[in-house]
Amino acid sequence: MYTCSIIIYILTFWQLSKIKKQVAAAEKQVMTVTEKQEAVAEFYDKSTDAWEVFFGEHLHDGFYEPGTTATIPGSKVAVVRMIDELLRFAGISDDPEKKPKTMLDVGCGLGGTCLHVAKKYDIKCTGITISPEQVKCAQDLAATQGLESKVSFDVGDALDMPYKDGTFDLVFTIQCIEHIQDKEKFIREMVRVAAPGAPVVIAGYAARNLSPSEESLKPEEKMVLEKICDHIVLSWLCSTGDYVKWLTPLPVQDIKVWDLTQNITPFYPLCIKEAFTWKSFTSLLKMGGWSAIKVVFAVKMMAMAAEEGLLKFAAVTCRKSK
């Protein structure tokens, strides 16, 4: 275990040292939107089984009290708590007369959010993801838990969702928008399918906001974020300020931002500890191949970037105007 950890740490720092040379090298091949979507679908199709072993049906970060030590049993509670905390921040009511009747989870993964919300809040949930393998897993989980009548899952494009305007009483996404190239269009699409008065919740990773004197991130900061994105098939990372800017001209109100970075960072040491054992490392390699292993490298870089204040985890919520 110790030898494996040392090797992985050396490789991680070696990769970070190569960032500047790689960025300054030949121009990267430009992928079309379709190719990027296919890459994201392939990434999750190949790595879903591997990460499900470690984190269950929730493929997103958990909510921890700052400074706590995360554990595997605790992480399964934390990922569910993250959902509840985001819904609380969005003002979701427990009152049967006021709570949403329907919810859409964009980028639903294995369906964990839909299954939890359907059970706890008695809300009919729909999930959409670009990965056919994830839809199959989500449908199997719903059947196992006896929730087929309360949840449904679709394979679809988040930029062109197959739903009518104003369909859902709550529109939710967590750790999906990072994969999307046209984030402004993604946000417009989420608002489009939200019913009048419906909360819209966007949560995930973001770059730090710029100071008034800055026009862009520093070159070395851009390099680090590009490397992280490359490892986990993210398109690029904008700031929460960008989200607010894109939401402002849309028919929404009550825009709020919540920085949750300190609430997710206890997860990093746990992930690194568990994934960097020889047993876990070889298991990830066997089940998920290089796609799963690259996530391990990314987690270390993400922990460093978050500690330096470059990488943020945040939520932006609003309500569609009536």
UniProtKB/Swiss-Prot annotation:
GO terms for molecular function: N-methyltransferase activity; S-adenosylmethionine-dependent methyltransferase activity. Homodimer. Its EC number is 2.1.1.-. Optimum temperature is 22 degrees Celsius. This is Picrinine-N-methytransferase. The lineage of its organism: Eukaryota, Viridiplantae, Streptophyta, Embryophyta, Tracheophyta. The gene is PiNMT. It catalyses: picrinine + S-adenosyl-L-methionine = ervincine + S-adenosyl-L-homocysteine + H(+). Accumulates in tissues actively synthesizing monoterpenoid indole alkaloids (MIAs) (at protein level). Mainly expressed in young leaves, but barely in roots and stems.
